Swiss-Prot record:
InterPro entries: ATPase_P-typ_cation-transptr_C (IPR006068), ATPase_P-typ_cation-transptr_N (IPR004014), ATPase_P-typ_cyto_dom_N (IPR023299), ATPase_P-typ_P_site (IPR018303), ATPase_P-typ_TM_dom_sf (IPR023298), ATPase_P-typ_transduc_dom_A_sf (IPR008250), HAD-like_sf (IPR036412), HAD_sf (IPR023214). Its main location: membrane. Belongs to the cation transport ATPase (P-type) (TC 3.A.3) family. Type IID subfamily. PANTHER family: CALCIUM-TRANSPORTING ATPASE. The chain crosses the membrane at residues 64-84, 91-111, 283-303, 313-333, 816-836, 849-869, 886-906, 944-964, 992-1012, 1022-1042. It comes from the Eukaryota. Residues 1-63, 112-282, 334-815, 870-885, 965-991, 1043-1091 are cytoplasmic. Residues 499-525 are annotated as: Disordered. The lineage of its organism: Eukaryota, Fungi, Dikarya, Ascomycota, Saccharomycotina. This is Sodium/potassium exporting P-type ATPase 1. It is a multi-pass membrane protein. The gene is ENA1.
Length: 1091
């Protein structure tokens, strides 16, 4: 057992298995290549090494959760108030405060518990099985039970459960894009052994296979060498865990300075002022500010009594302190965000961290991957060039698998290069090529045999299948995306694979169509072509070919396709100038073809070449035929070049519209992709990330707009900061490039989001202000590092998230304004109330502590929730992002808070004094802050009037802040009827409507129910005072409307003096205008790339 432990310790530290042979690796790790581990050894290693996971489920620490909820400055004020109340034996006030604390903490606990469970469920979205050899027998086990030393078997479609030193490989390729970012499969070879002195990167260790990689071809056997956090992917996951960095030492500073800095960081983290999103930090700072204001006001109360503090003075101090704390804010904020997160699920956005949804409202820049996010992740044929025949173009095809969609046109005789350089403009484009083909309505000088030969090759040098699913009535396809694109075009031209080979397809929709290109299946049960042999695509030669026998003309045919350079190297001839005779392929001819390859590539297309050759039965004997069908070099020699196809991954239908809306919202979109420059540039121009026909740009701007990863990484930080514009497109982008891009954005004070799906994207996802992972193709590690997960991997869903984030920010701003204005009103009202002295010279509070809490917690809480549910404003996505540094506390909000607070204070004070001195005798009695006595009648009745006034003013304020500038009676100026508009305004948000109605009605039972009114709320039933309450509530409403009218006049004047701030004119402005050096419009922007 001790020896085993030593081996395991050595294995954990050893990272050079690529330098060992399979036998040496097996001996080092202590396993058998044929028998695998014994059951006893497996049990021991599982106990020693642990399960093969990237970390346990997040443990639910209830104590820590409670502490996290309590460590809030607002809750601290409530706690202190509760303790003082109980110490003074004011059980009612203490009990009410305890209830408020319990509600806040409970709701926070529930939400944090849900977030923890969500994280755990995301970790367990995929838990694949593993196939291993133990005790000489093959077993299927859960991948978490894999341990170092297991012999693992993997095949096509499997996810590799751990890092492996390969023993055997058979045509074995893996997709390591989640780890390395490289999209192309990597061919593995178990027989390779690398030198110990060589510096071999992870991606180049071709005798190893890595955890979480997908097997895309072949099968293999390997020794498990690393599991869990010791695997390559585990190392990335471990780096993401990190530490808080709160306590650190700077060698250049003294011990005292370091202690002070660390104390500030820890205190800030404890109070939430230096961690979290901008809103979280702002609210935490607000809570701290309100805490000290509450303490200050309590001191003022005690000072007014010359610090002669008894029970009544202490209770008054508590009352004033409570008036400054928006006790329901945490509850309302949590519920609003929870509702927003629930809404986003229906819009394909899963919110892992609630605060991140609000943070999206401040996003200035979005950095997105291309494949599968901006694009469909599927391939479409776009252009085909057949020498001496012409260029075929396929357009308006949205469904990559549907051959019945799209328009096919032909430019006769012109090549893509000739067409792009043609200055006459008239090239004789023939629309509806397929219909013309059937009707034989084509120019006589066009040789259809050339098209027939190319299409036959495209169909047969292909193993993909395209069919219509009868159950769903949808077109589907199986095979490689590139081959599917070619097969879809062949099917579009009524020459699918099974039409030539006779393979049965119950789902073939074109079985009744008569092909104009082939007379296949003339005899029942016969097939024109019989498959003889195939040489599959190989990443080394980058081509594939198939050998068929043509039963109709008794010829053997070899059809090949692949990368242009690979195919052209196998060709010795092509069809000559007359398009009929085969002529030798000269260097000049190859250069002509290559120009067309570049022309297609510059349009962002992936280019493949096609070639074929044929010979009769009489031209070869059996030995020669056997050599051709078994020897790739022989079969793929002396081919005849037939043509090119350009295919591409089309943008999603929603992408261009989403990009346009982002630009309209003042958000820049950057494409960071591993694809080639030409492809990235073309897609970016197609969806609007890059300009096309708008303005003329300086060369400096052009060079900055599009870069390769190596160009960007080659710049120093100073050079990046000096760029006139950060790149809108970075091609051949590495994970480190993405991190550098985020750092550059942060240095420019930008608030950015990053999308990603691979493990290698995790550092950039975590560094971005908002990390967005892909739900379908994303790795578990990337989801763990993200704040938001897109369940459909669709770029347009980010628009949904940003819109919801802005809506929430708007609504949070509204209810924060409502709640804080009430706090200001109550605090000013109570401070002014210090002037009311009873017969003993003690201050009489014009509102009791329970009245204060009732208004803050009960009356205001539900309208605030209603404000949180307000629909998005019509111009929401026409505004620029809000300043993340300022957040929701703009100068307008701050001024509004004090303005409404002062108007409300005036209304309530007028109601109290009018009741006390107008309707009643004006007697202030004695000991009226405690138990009721006969001398307190006037005070108790006046409190009721003031309580009703403040309650109703708070409710009216909720309606007023629905729009911060428009009149409550003209919320929707586009409505013709004022009456209809009024009812639309109050009924549009039914939750808000009924919560306000509830608040209005609730004032009556609170005033009239015996015991509750005089024992708890310290007020009495009233009569004529209701008239005062109603009158001064209306006065507040009029005051609020007059204030908003003044605001509208002010901002109208500001727009007149500063038209650039007008939203409507900004919407008409070109999003790239800031980069323009002239106003010459409709100038083609030719963005060149430095080589």
């Amino acid at each position: 057992m001790g020896e085993g432990t030593t081996k395991e310790n050595n294995n954990a530290e050893f990272n050079a298995y690529h330098t060992l042979t399979a036998e040496e690796a097996a001996e080092f790790i202590g396993t058998s290549l044929t028998e695998g581990l014994t059951q006893d050894e497996f049990v021991h290693r599982l106990k020693t090494v642990g399960e093969n996971t990237l970390g346990d489920d997040t443990k639910i620490d209830y104590k820590a959760m409670v502490l996290h909820q309590v460590c809030n400055a607002m809750i601290m004020v409530l706690l202190i108030s509760m303790i003082i109340s109980f110490a003074m034996h004011d059980w009612i006030t203490g009990g009410v405060i305890s209830f408020v604390i319990a509600v806040n903490v409970l709701i926070g606990l529930v939400q944090e518990y849900k977030a923890t469970k969500t994280m755990n469920s995301l970790k367990n979205l995929s838990s694949p099985n593993a196939h291993v050899i133990r005790n000489g027998k093959s077993e299927t086990i859960n991948s978490k039970d894999v341990v170092p030393g297991d012999i693992c078997l993997v095949k096509v479609g499997d996810t590799i459960p751990a890092d492996l030193r390969l023993i055997e490989t058979k045509n074995f390729d893996t997709d390591e894009s989640l780890l390395t970012g490289e999209s192309l499969p990597v061919s593995k070879d178990a027989n390779l052994v690398f030198g110990k002195e060589e510096e071999t990167s992870v991606g180049d260790r071709l005798n190893l296979a890595f955890s979480s990689s997908a097997v895309v071809k072949g099968r293999a056997k390997g020794i498990v060498i690393k599991t869990a956090l010791n695997s390559e992917i585990g190392k990335i996951a471990k780096s993401l865990q990190g530490d808080s960095g709160l306590i650190s030492r700077d060698p250049s500073k003294s011990w005292l300075q370091n202690t002070w800095i660390s104390t500030k960081k820890v205190t800030g983290a404890f109070l939430g002022t230096n961690v979290g999103t901008p809103l979280h930090r702002k609210l935490s700072k607000l809570a701290v500010l309100l805490f000290w204001i509450a303490v200050l006001f309590a001191i003022i109360v005690m000072a007014s009594q010359k610090f002669d503090v008894d029970k009544r003075v202490a209770i008054y101090a508590i009352c004033v302190a409570l008036s400054m704390i928006p006790s329901s804010l945490v509850v309302v904020l949590t519920i609003t965000m929870s509702v927003g997160a629930a809404v986003m699920v229906s819009r394909n956005v899963i919110v892992r961290k609630l605060d991140s949804l609000e943070a999206l409202g401040a996003v200035n820049d979005i950095c997105s991957d291309k494949t599968g996010t901006l694009t469909q992740g599927k391939m479409l044929a776009r252009q085909i060039w057949i020498p001496r025949f012409g260029t075929i173009t396929i357009s308006n095809s949205d469904d990559p698998f549907n051959p019945n969609e799209g328009n096919v046109s032909l430019i006769p005789r012109f090549s893509p290069y000739e067409y792009s350089h043609n200055e006459d403009g008239d090239v004789g484009i023939l629309q509806n090529f397929k219909d013309r083909l059937y009707e034989k309505d084509l120019p006589e000088d066009i040789d259809m045999d050339l098209f027939q030969k190319w299409l036959e090759t495209a169909t047969l040098a292909n193993i993909a299948t395209v069919f219509k699913d009868d159950a769903t009535d949808c077109w589907k396809a199986h095979g490689d995306p590139t081959e599917i694109a070619i097969q879809v075009f062949a099917t579009k031209m009524d020459l699918p694979h099974n039409a030539l080979t006779g393979e049965k397809s119950t789902n073939q929709s074109n079985e009744n169509d008569q092909s104009s290109l082939s007379q296949h299946n003339e005899k029942p049960g016969s097939a024109q072509f019989e498959h003889i042999a195939e040489f599959p695509f190989d990443s080394t030669v980058k081509r594939m070919s198939s050998v068929y026998y043509n039963n109709h003309n008794e010829t053997y045919n070899i059809y090949g396709k692949g990368a242009f350079e690979s195919i052209i190297s196998c060709c010795s001839s092509w069809y000559g100038k007359d398009g009929v005779k085969i002529t030798p392929l000269t260097d000049c001819d190859v250069e002509t073809i290559r120009k067309n390859v570049y022309s297609l590539s510059n349009e962002g297309l992936r280019v493949l070449g096609f070639a074929s050759k044929s010979f009769t039965k009489d031209q070869v004997n059996d030995d020669q035929l056997k050599n051709i069908t078994s020897n790739r070099a022989t079969a793929e020699s002396d081919l005849v070049f037939l043509g090119l196809i350009g295919i591409y991954d089309p943008p999603r239908n929603e992408t261009a519209g989403a990009v346009k809306k982002f630009h309209q919202a003042g958000i820049n979109v950057h494409m960071l992709t591993g694809d080639f420059v030409g492809t990235a540039k073309a897609i970016a121009q197609e969806v609007g990330i890059l300009p096309t026909n708008l303005y003329h740009y300086s060369q400096e701007i052009v060079d900055s707009m599009v870069m390769t990863g190596s160009q960007f990484d080659g710049l120093s930080e100073e050079e990046v900061d000096d760029l006139p514009v950060l790149p809108l497109v970075i091609a051949r982008c590495s994970p480190q490039t993405k991190v550098r891009m985020i750092e550059a954005l942060h240095r420019r004070k930008k608030f950015c989001t990053m999308t990603g799906d691979g493990v290698n994207d995790s550092p950039s996802l975590k560094m971005a202000n908002v990390g967005i992972a892909m739900g379908i193709n994303g790795s578990d590690v990337s989801k763990e590092a993200s704040d938001i997960v897109l369940s459909d991997d669709n770029f347009a869903s980010i628009l949904n998230a940003v819109e919801e984030g802005r809506r929430m920010t708007d609504n949070i701003q509204k209810f924060v304004l409502q709640l804080l204005a009430e706090n200001v009103a109550q605090a000013l009202y109570l401070i002014i109330g210090l002037v009311f002295r009873d017969e003993n010279g003690k201050s009489v509070f014009p509102l009791s502590p329970v009245e204060v809490l009732w208004i803050i917690v009960v009356t205001s809480c539900f309208p605030a929730m209603g404000l949180g549910l307000e629909k998005a404003a019509p111009d929401l996505m026409d505004r620029p992002p809000h300043d993340s540094e300022v957040g929701i506390f703009t100068w307008e909000v701050i001024i509004d808070t004090f303005a409404y607070g002062i108007i409300m204070t005036g209304s309530c004070m007028a109601s109290f004094t009018g009741s006390l001195y107008g309707i009643n005798s004006g007697r202030l009695g004695h000991d009226c802050d405690g138990t009721y006595n006969s001398s307190c009648r006037d005070v108790y009745r006046s409190r009721s009037a003031a309580f009703a006034t403040m309650t109703w003013c708070a409710l009216i304020l909720a309606w007023e802040v629905v729009d911060m500038r428009r009149s409550f009676f003209r919320m929707h100026p586009d409505t013709d009827s004022p009456v209809k508009e009024f009812f639309r305004s109050i009924w549009g948000n039914q939750f808000l409507f009924w919560s306000i109605i509830f608040g209005f009605v609730s004032a009556f039972p609170v005033v009239y129910i015996p015991v509750i009114n005089d024992k708890v709320f310290l007020h009495k039933p009233i009569g004529a005072e209701w008239g005062l309450a109603i009158a001064f509530t209306i006065a507040f409403w009029i005051g609020a409307e007059l204030y908003k009218c003044g605001k509208r006049r002010y901002f109208k004047t500001q727009r007149a003096h500063n038209p650039e701030n007008d939203l409507e004119s900004n919407n008409k402005r070109d999003p790239f205008e800031a980069y323009s050096t002239s106003t010459t419009i409709h100038t083609e922007v030719n963005i060149g790339i430095k080589q």
